[in-house]
Design a protein with these regions (language model features):
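Left-handed beta-helix
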Residues: 202-204, 208-424
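Short coil/turn connectors at secondary-structure junctions
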Residues: 1, 54-55, 75, 107-109, ...
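Conserved N-terminal catalytic core of the sugar/cofactor nucleotidyltransferase
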Residues: 2-5, 15-20, 30-113, 119-125, ...
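Short beta-strand segments
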Residues: 6-7, 60, 113-115, 144-148, ...
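Active-site metal-binding loops of divalent metal-dependent hydrolases
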Residues: 10, 117-118, 398
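Conserved core of the sugar-phosphate nucleotidyltransferase
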Residues: 122-217, 224-225, 245
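Residue-level signal for inorganic ion chemistry
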Residues: 41, 95, 117, 159, ...
Length: 424
């Protein structure tokens, strides 16, 4: 069995902790029990590796998110880079064609696909490994995982199974209903939340790509990717497939892709430098800045702060965040890099000051364009010709390689200047 994990997305639902580069899958909000925080992606990979260290995992992410993936996972997983955002079916088709043409995976191999925008315990990931077995019945082309509802919710689509058995044929799908209709689905039809988890054979995905895009060749799809039809996997595949089964899951699972879900999941635990009085109620505060947030007497709020902005919202207004955030959507200031990370401290029309973090053992080349000068000041750590207090300047058009012996933090100041005509 192989797995494809979808990690694209624009990051608006968890703004300002996420952005279009550092999307929600990369937001490190979950305590690992050792005082460190990890992301949904890191949690998913950790759980999968605990069950089967050798299973092949392919991450499908946008090209702008490649550095984020490598920053958190290194080179331990395969990665397909989407040149642009074209919805889930193009992303899955590209990953499937990569498995065929690059990794030479057997067309009959079961493939499990899911989006990394939920948080679940070990039993959920163990269930993923059993989905491929259902395909062996000779009649099922596609298997879904349905979540046993904990309440009638209008946040999810619903799967209507043919029975209440652990594995059942799928009778119908229903888009997000109101809570009364959802209650009826659950009571009368044993309905399940649609978790966006699919399993099928590789050749099935390739056939669907051929039908929709006229090709299942990786070289062809990557070349044409920006022009491929924007279409979801649900619309391109699920709604058109008559032979679908669903496996029922009744363990811990939470949609962590919104502040509403995150607030429930974190139980309104504070993250970062936060001080609150005992009159605060039902309020989640997440602070990724290096100065404190003081909260007094606030109720039913989500407060989140990062270099990208500050959110203060009543919880019942959180569903509107994705549309409202466009008014303050700026170039990201927090960016993961394969060597560590970059945090923009100050930005103006002609200058930018950033904190760079470089992991021990990493090597990075700092470049400058014509008309740009950079000054680097080492704050912590050591490397070749570097120690705390070292200052060096990179003139325009030059480059400097940093080899980190230990973890290094440094301040990078970039200044643009006008070029005299004789210097062209």
């Amino acid at each position: 069995m192989k797995m494809i994990l979808l990690c694209g997305g624009g990051g608006k639902r968890l703004w300002p902790i996420s952005n279009n580069v550092h999307s929600k899958q990369f937001a490190q909000l979950f305590d690992d029990g050792n005082g460190n925080y990890r992301s949904m992606l890191e949690h998913a990979i950790s759980e999968i590796r605990e069950i089967d260290p050798n299973v092949q995992v392919t991450i499908a992410a946008g090209r702008v998110q490649t550095e984020e993936v490598r920053s958190q996972l290194g080179f331990d997983v395969s990665l397909t880079e989407e040149p642009s955002r074209r919805n889930t079916f193009p992303a899955i088709s590209l990953a499937a064609s990569y498995l065929k043409d690059h990794d030479h995976v057997d067309p009959q191999e079961p493939i499990v696909i899911f989006s990394v925008d939920s948080y679940a315990d070990r039993s959920f990931y163990e269930s993923l490994f059993s989905l491929g077995e259902i395909l062996d019945d000779g009649k099922t082309n596609l298997v879904l995982m349905g979540i046993e509802p904990t309440s009638p919710s209008d946040k999810y689509g619903y799967i209507i199974p043919a029975s209440s058995d652990e594995v059942s044929e799928v009778r119908a799908f229903r888009e997000k209903p109101d809570t009364e209709t959802a209650k009826k689905y659950i009571e009368e039809h044993h309905a399940l939340w649609n978790a966006g988890v699919f399993a099928c054979r590789l050749e099935y995905l390739l056939r669907r790509a051929d039908i929709v895009f006229g090709s299942s060749s990786y070289a062809n799809l990557i070349q044409r990717y920006p022009e491929l039809k924007k279409i979801s996997f649900d619309y391109a595949v699920v709604e058109k497939e008559p032979n679908i089964a669903v496996k029922r899951y009744n363990g811990t699972w939470t949609d962590a892709g919104t502040w509403t879900g995150m607030s429930d999941l974190l139980n309104d635990k504070d993250i970062g430098q936060v001080v609150r009085d005992d009159q605060c109620e039902n309020t989640l505060i997440v602070n990724h800045l290096d100065f404190p947030i003081l909260a007094m007497g606030v109720k039913n709020l989500v407060v989140a702060a990062s270099r990208d902005g500050i959110l203060v919202a009543e919880k019942d207004r959180i569903p509107d965040l994705k549309t409202v955030v466009d008014e303050v959507w700026l170039e990201p200031r927090v960016i993961g890099k394969r060597y560590g990370g970059k945090e923009v401290l100050h930005r103006s029309e002609s200058s930018e000051t950033s904190l760079l973090t470089i992991r021990a053992g990493s090597s990075v080349t700092i470049k400058t364009d014509i008309g740009v000068r950079k000054t680097l000041t080492v704050l912590h750590g050591a490397g070749e010709k570097m120690k705390p207090g070292t200052i060096f300047t990179i003139q325009d058009g030059e480059k400097w390689q940093i080899n980190a012996d230990t973890d290094i933090e440094l301040i990078e100041t970039m200044i643009e200047f006008e070029i005299e005509p004789e210097n062209y």
